[in-house]
From Swiss-Prot:
It catalyses: N(2)-succinyl-L-arginine + 2 H2O + 2 H(+) = N(2)-succinyl-L-ornithine + 2 NH4(+) + CO2. This is N-succinylarginine dihydrolase. It comes from Pseudomonas putida (strain ATCC 47054 / DSM 6125 / CFBP 8728 / NCIMB 11950 / KT2440). It is an enzyme of class 3 (hydrolase). Catalyzes the hydrolysis of N(2)-succinylarginine into N(2)-succinylornithine, ammonia and CO(2). Residues 23-43 are annotated as: Disordered.
Length: 449
């Protein structure tokens, strides 16, 4: 039976704005309070989805969240009608309103961790929604994320869904942004690679000094247990605390893996040789031939990697076995990074081509191509069991473009978030979207009695 890696990209929501909410994310902080263009952001994301689908890659869509999150504001003590809640929050606590309007769910690499059926004890695809406990604006996402994933992957014969881990710092979980899977073929048993920033319960592990380590070892271990993964198919690695302090807030900002290949920066991990040795040995035991592509700091400094998002790229396998690297425009604009990519594709390794996309609206908030997608490895029968309304086609692309143009503003500043009409616009758009994507009632406003 054939198997595929399907990329489900987050559709940018109507409240996309530059709130500067993500401490430790350099781009998010440096573009704080600029005016955003939600319509352009959504169109840029859709263009990438359509281009990859046209190239023969399996592509799906993950719906955005209801924003502003009025229920979250009510839990913080704001009362009255929905409009009154928004206006009172704007007057009394603007940072809370900004957080409740965040469109950060577009970065679906943080939506969940996914283990394919070939790796799990019960032979089903397992999903654990990420609690995103480190940042308030993201910690409110997982209930809706779970409902959306449940509506997309709704056949219990093939799919198992787990609630987010306990919402405390000790189990801080950032989802697939700190998880990669290596395999010979997508449908065969592989090795799941969990990267953490610190240990919650063992003080012997080093930790960053400036920025928070968002993922704990204990969270990664809990997800592996929930998914029924065997020890011979799991490797844990600690991310280098020094690069977290340089703005590498998730591992997908300093490495990317696919198939048998890990593309990583020289400074990405602690005890790199031991980590690579484990990956090589465990993948070999499953018939695979692990290949590591190390980018030396002499060629690309960590600062350049963070600024260009070289590693927040998509490493995709073509039918002929070669690989394509999907990078943001910022890589072409960085002389050193672009020179390195020229060498990479000409030196005879697995990466044969680099494809550049303009994702500026997302990039200015600190999210590149890899942030925007959740990878799900599926066998043919499993893919057939996915809700087909979320699979990208030419028709769906056209429908979503028209939907965006109807409902999205082309400019959004902080003052606009206080406009109660924005909530009405968002709910109207999402109500229509659930019909387009055949999701049912996944949003809180659709579920109110």
């Amino acid at each position: 039976m054939k198997s595929y890696e399907v990329n489900f990209d987050g559709l940018v929501g109507p409240t996309h704005n530059y709130g500067g909410l993500s401490y430790g994310n350099v781009a998010s902080q440096s573009n704080s309070q600029q005016a955003s263009n939600p319509r352009e952001a959504a169109r840029q994301g859709l263009a990438k989805m359509k281009a990859l689908a046209d190239m023969g890659f399996k592509q799906g869509v993950l719906a955005p969240q209801e924003r502003p999150d009025v229920a979250a504001l009510r839990r913080l003590g704001f009362s009255g009608s929905d409009a009154e809640v928004i206006q009172r929050a704007a007057r009394e606590a603007m940072p809370l309103l900004v957080a409740s309007c965040s469109a950060s769910s577009m970065w679906v690499a943080n939506a969940a961790t996914v283990s394919p059926s070939a790796d799990t004890a019960d032979g089903r695809v397992h999903f654990t929604a990420a609690n995103l406990n480190c940042k308030y604006h993201r910690s409110i996402e997982h209930p809706t994320t779970s409902r959306v994933l449940g509506a997309m992957f709704n056949d219990e014969k093939y799919f198992a869904h787990h609630a987010a881990l306990p919402a405390v710092a000790q189990f801080g979980d950032e989802g697939a942004a700190n998880h990669t899977r290596f395999c010979r073929a997508y449908g065969e048993a592989g090795v799941e690679f969990f990267v953490y920033g610190r240990s919650a319960f063992d003080s012997r592990y080093p930790a960053p000094q400036k920025y928070p380590a968002r993922q704990t070892l204990e969270a990664s271990q809990a997800v592996a247990r929930l998914h029924g993964l065997s020890d011979d198919g799991v490797v844990y690695a600690q991310q280098n605390p020094a690069v977290i302090d340089q703005g590498v807030f998730h591992n997908d900002v300093i490495s990317v893996g696919n198939g048998e290949v890990l593309f990583y920066h020289e400074d990405a991990f602690l005890e790199t040789d031991a980590v690579l040795g484990q990956l090589r040995a465990k993948l070999a035991s499953k018939g695979g031939n692990f290949q590591a592509i190390c980018v030396p700091r002499a060629a690309v400094a960590v600062e350049d990697a963070v600024r260009s998002y070289l590693f927040n790229s998509q490493l995709l396998s073509r039918e002929d076995g070669s690989m394509l690297l999907v990078v943001p425009e910022e890589c072409r604009n960085n002389e050193r990074v672009w020179a390195y990519l020229g060498q990479l594709t000409s030196q005879g390794g697995p990466v044969k081509e680099v494809k550049v996309f303009d994702l500026k609206q997302s990039m200015q908030n600190g999210g590149g191509p890899a942030c925007l997608r959740l990878r799900v490895a599926l066998k043919e029968a499993e893919l057939a069991a996915v809700n087909q309304g979320v699979i990208m086609t030419a028709t769906l692309y056209d429908t979503l473009l028209q939907w965006v143009d109807r409902h999205y503003r082309d400019r959004l500043g902080e003052a606009d978030l206080a406009d109660p009409q924005l909530l009405v616009e968002c709910r109207t758009a999402l109500d229509e979207l659930t019909q387009i994507l055949k999701l049912g009632s996944v949003y809180p406003f659709q579920r109110q009695p």
